[in-house]
Amino acid sequence: MKIYIFLILITGIGFSQATGLSAYGVGEKIHNSDPASLALGNSSFFSGNSKHISIDSPSSLWRSTLTRFSIHSGFNYLSTTQYPDQHQQNLTSFSILFPVGIKKVFGFGLQPTYRSNKLNITDEDFKFIGADESITGAPIAYRNTYTIDGGISELFLLYSQKLTHNISGGIKYSLLFGNQILNDELYTYDVEFDTSSSGGMLINEFVDNEDTLYAKANNGVMTEINKHRKFSGSSISAEGRYADEKHEFVINLMLNGKINVETTNQLTMVNSSTTNTFENSATNFSSNFGLGYRYKILNNSGISVEIHNKSPFNIPENAAIFNIMPPGEKSIHFGSYYQIRNSKIGYWNNLNIRGGAYT
């Protein structure tokens, strides 16, 4: 018995690899949290399980008559040459689904959509302002330390129903909300040049006519800017599905409303502090479109393909991290699955083998 429980725990864990750092927009987009769909080329519409239910696909949820309570948690580790190693452990989703009639399912849940959890970025090298550009008439050295934390979450309601023998549909409505803090510490120093490296904080050295000059930082001053942003908005998505004996087609359209942002800036310099608050919102709506197809080769195997076109998330530009807007996304996903079914009554009914790729 212990062996079977151990195998269930091992096979229920999903592993994903991050290849970039989302220091723009509102942070990292939290994608698919279902390990089964991740293995199927990061699919949104298909999972390859025996019921062909995908957590992120409202038009498939009616296929189960059971009440389902789900919690997903994930750990991310990111190592780059530009920034310190980043470690993140967070709750990725929570949801409850239950039947409300024949072939009808209702559900609600909470999950993050964009997130930066304690992201720390520090300039490794000093930057310089020459005496001809400095307001003090003397050279200045400076560097920044940034701390970014928070993002946007969604509280969602969804409904799924089988409409006819071949057609089903689903709808999902989300309230978007969240807070994000960006702390910017700017350290500035007066720069003095000397032929001796002793005394003061050495920040650089220069060779001039075979003589070495050492740049030293003195009279350090820290200027701190705390930006607190409060987000609010909504989105709605509708999905339709057609399925017959061999083929399955899915189409999904999501509309994002205008995101409202309330920003509070607090500037602290030496012994003075100033605070200002303002509100603004995105000027346009945005939309996401997805199209999927699954072909059943045999009763226990099949292949799938999906195409997604996602518009940039609609936030005001001055509310984006480092004023860099999130990009739009276009992707294509391929997946395949094979089910090993157990004809005997026991501790397991089938073993699913999946593979996929996306770009």
Kindly label every feature range from the protein language model.
Residues Q17-T359:
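Subset of outer-membrane beta-barrel
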Residues I3-I13:
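Sec-dependent N-terminal signal peptides
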